[in-house]
């Protein structure tokens, strides 16, 4: 099954409770606007739990918010879970556990059994042309209500480009890097 990361966006109502809510809403999509703890809990339940099913959130693009119980992991049916998302290799999220420690030549800490070991068996980073992605976002985001095309362009540069650079910095943490073809290369 595919476990989409978008369901772990912090709901808009919770973002509006942040101390600087206008900034949090504007930067939605940045690492701190996702619920990494909920993702970690669900990965723990899937990987190390014994529940026959685990309900997982999705993202309702029509509402612009996560939707609880949108996906179901069934232990009896799903032998492979592909977890996809932007910040899964983000070092502050601690989702790679021993995988990254082994890659970096570090030894497991003796007696530390709570280090998220085993969330991912293998990680793949799909690298895309940054400029092409930024331009696609500018076009896609023009449907966001309340923003002019110029405001969308500014937001993409200030928010989405920064987020993309954050993602790119985690590329070396993956076991495999695959280069995505641009439109001109795939024709």
Predicted regions and their residues:
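Conserved RecA-like P-loop NTPase ATPase core
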Residues: 6, 39, 82, 124, ...
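Receiver (REC) domain switch/active-site residues of two-component response regulators
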Residues: 6, 121, 175
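Conserved catalytic segments around the Walker B and adjacent sensor/switch elements
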Residues: 1-4
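Alpha-helical scaffold elements adjacent to nucleotide-binding pockets in ATP/GTP-utilizing enzyme cores
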Residues: 38, 42, 133-140, 155
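Small-molecule kinase domains that catalyze NTP-dependent phosphoryl transfer to phosphate-bearing small molecules
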Residues: 110-115, 139, 143-187
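Short gly/ser/thr-rich secondary-structure transition/capping motifs
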Residues: 58-68, 83-86, 156-161
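Conserved nucleotide-sensing/catalytic segment adjacent to the nucleotide-binding pocket
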Residues: 9-63
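ATP-dependent NMP and nucleoside kinases share a basic, alpha-helical "lid"
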Residues: 66-140
């Amino acid at each position: 099954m595919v476990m989409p990361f978008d369901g772990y966006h912090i709901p808009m109502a919770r973002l509006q409770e942040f101390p600087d809510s206008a900034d949090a809403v504007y930067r939605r999509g940045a690492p701190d606007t996702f619920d990494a703890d909920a993702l970690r809990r669900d990965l723990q339940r899937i990987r190390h739990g014994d529940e026959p099913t685990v309900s997982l959130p999705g993202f309702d693009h029509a509402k612009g918010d996560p939707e609880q119980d949108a996906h179901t992991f069934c232990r009896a049916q799903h032998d492979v879970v592909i977890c996809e998302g932007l910040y899964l290799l983000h070092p502050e999220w601690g989702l790679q556990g021993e995988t990254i420690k082994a890659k970096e030549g570090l030894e497991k800490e003796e007696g530390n059994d709570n280090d998220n070991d085993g969330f991912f068996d293998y990680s793949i980073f799909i690298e895309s042309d940054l400029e092409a992605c930024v331009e696609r976002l500018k076009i896609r985001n023009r449907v966001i209500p309340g923003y002019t095309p110029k405001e969308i362009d500014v937001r993409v540069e200030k928010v989405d480009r920064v987020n993309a650079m954050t993602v790119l910095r985690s590329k070396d943490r993956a076991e495999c890097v695959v280069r995505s073809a641009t439109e001109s290369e795939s024709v």
